[in-house]
Amino acid sequence: FLSLIPAAISAVSALADHF
């Protein structure tokens, strides 16, 4: 489960950087 956290963070960072 913890391995999903960095992926989620990078996804949110990508969305935040896109907007």
From Swiss-Prot:
The keyword Secreted applies. Expressed by the skin glands. Disulfide bonds: none annotated. Signal peptide: none annotated. GO terms for cellular component: extracellular region. It comes from the Eukaryota. It is found in: Secreted. Keywords: Amidation, Amphibian defense peptide, Antimicrobial, Secreted. One of its GO terms (biological process) is defense response. The modification Phenylalanine amide is found at residue 19. Belongs to the frog skin active peptide (FSAP) family. Phylloseptin subfamily. Has antimicrobial activity. This is Phylloseptin-Az6. It comes from Pithecopus azureus.
